[in-house]
């Protein structure tokens, strides 16, 4: 009995949320390539997120997330989701120095998105924070 009342207060049965289909012919693709992962975000021209994917959300774990193939799969997944909303052309903005940055751009083009421009927006410090120490293996 208590379970029924608590469910009614929440609004009844939970319905699966349906993603509404937008019509966005041109947008932006942000590729954030770190040494551990690659995140691909596709937005409309105003910056509102249409679709996103990452190597981790594409099923890769651990050191496999940092491979170019994982970045390719992540970019394909994000492109497929964005093309469902009508996206055809993208301006690509790349940030970071990870292994997957080149492969992610190629995957966006191979998925059917027309790459209009590629801009590197990697932040470069003017001698700010001290970088991490070098790895010794």
Curated annotation (Swiss-Prot):
The lineage of its organism: Bacteria, Pseudomonadati, Thermomicrobiota, Thermomicrobia, Thermomicrobiales. Residues 15-25 have a biased composition (Basic residues). The gene is rpsK. GO terms for cellular component: ribonucleoprotein complex; ribosome. Located on the platform of the 30S subunit, it bridges several disparate RNA helices of the 16S rRNA. Forms part of the Shine-Dalgarno cleft in the 70S ribosome. Belongs to the universal ribosomal protein uS11 family. Keywords: Ribonucleoprotein, Ribosomal protein, RNA-binding, rRNA-binding. Residues 1-25 are annotated as: Disordered. InterPro entries: Ribosomal_uS11, Ribosomal_uS11_bac-type, Ribosomal_uS11_CS, Ribosomal_uS11_sf. GO terms for biological process: translation. HAMAP family: Ribosomal_uS11. Pfam families: Ribosomal_S11. GO terms for molecular function: rRNA binding; structural constituent of ribosome. The keyword Cell inner membrane does not apply. Part of the 30S ribosomal subunit. Interacts with proteins S7 and S18. Binds to IF-3. This is Small ribosomal subunit protein uS11. It comes from the Bacteria.
């Amino acid at each position: 009995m208590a379970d029924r009342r608590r469910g009614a207060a929440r609004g009844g049965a939970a319905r699966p949320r349906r993603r509404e289909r937008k019509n966005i012919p041109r947008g932006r693709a942000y590729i954030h390539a770190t040494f551990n992962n690659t995140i691909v975000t596709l937005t409309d021209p105003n910056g509102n997120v249409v679709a996103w994917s990452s190597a981790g959300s594409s099923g890769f774990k651990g050191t496999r997330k940092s491979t170019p193939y994982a970045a390719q799969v992540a970019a394909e997944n994000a492109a497929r989701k964005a093309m469902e909303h009508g996206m055809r052309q993208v301006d690509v903005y790349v940030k970071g120095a990870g292994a997957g940055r080149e492969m992610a751009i190629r995957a966006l083009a191979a998925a059917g998105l027309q790459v209009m421009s590629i801009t590197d927006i990697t932040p470069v410090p003017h001698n700010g924070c001290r970088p991490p120490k070098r790895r010794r293996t």
